[in-house]
Amino acid sequence: MVMFTIRNMGGVALFLAGSTWLWLTPMFATKGVTTSGFLWSATRALSLLAIVGFSVATVGLFARQPWWETTAIGSAAVGLLALVPYWFAGTQGGETTGTVAWNALVHVLMVAGITTLLLVPQLERWVQHQVMPG
């Protein structure tokens, strides 16, 4: 039994990437930052939806379900959408612009990587070859 396959590492990477949306929630805000209000609530809801979506996509990947890619792309889109209220909530709540910008940059790069792997036809075929074989 081989444990360190590209499929397994990709699944773990997908799950871990999804879990980083926790960084955008109020519980990860710097001490003293105001974390109440609609923008933080919207950030929390969208971030948790992205986390659940990435978790479901990971299960689909390991189960070799054809829908896992669509779920991963949808979760990435929801995660990208979560950055909008996060940016305003963080900067208006007292978070440093550097912290907000760093979190946004990391997540934009993750979304770019996921969508590139799953939407560029040559890369998507390679991913499918790694994930779907018997």
Where are the language model's segments positioned?
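Membrane-interface extramembranous regions
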Residues: V2-G134
